[in-house]
Amino acid sequence: MDELPEIIIETLKKRGVTELRPPQKLSIEKGLMRGKNLVVSSPTSSGKTLIAEIAMVKHFENRGKTLYIVPLKSLASEKFNSFKERYGEHGLKTALSIGDFDKQDKFLDSYDLIITTSEKTDSLIRHNASFFRNVSCVVIDEVHLLNDNSRGPTLEILITILRQMLPSAQFIALSATIKNDELLSKWL
């Protein structure tokens, strides 16, 4: 665990975590902290969120922003509360942007971590939100929704646009149930 950012080590100690789980170790081996794009497919409660946290803290230390995309407002609120509690004392400013789809949300420029839904991200892109110029990490939680008939095409287009807008950003896709993770990994 010595290679982890100090903020992560402190946070894990407070939570009583003394060692990483296999998916977390594998993600580090595959380049998590070197900015490599990753698809993390592992069971529920196996530590996928911590993988995203390690990346977002690493980007925070390098003055980059992380865009954390979730499918539901309730999940966005849950992540917001959790991350704010864990990392607020370390100076990482967390924002929740799930509301009005007809504005730019300029306030997001002053935040390090922006948690939002796919639909709100789409709106922020269409309104040319200025914070995007500093996004260096994009986390897509529940990426298996790409296989969903109703939400999948929209999510696929959103990821494609983000990859074009942010060609040097690190993309991390998280799922417990994705079936075609190797194909998705090649695409990212």
Q: Where do the protein language model's features map onto the residues?
A:
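Conserved P-loop/Walker A NTP-binding site and adjacent catalytic elements of P-loop NTPases
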Residues: 9-11, 15-188
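Conserved ASCE P-loop NTPase core motifs with emphasis on AAA+ ATPases
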Residues: 1-11
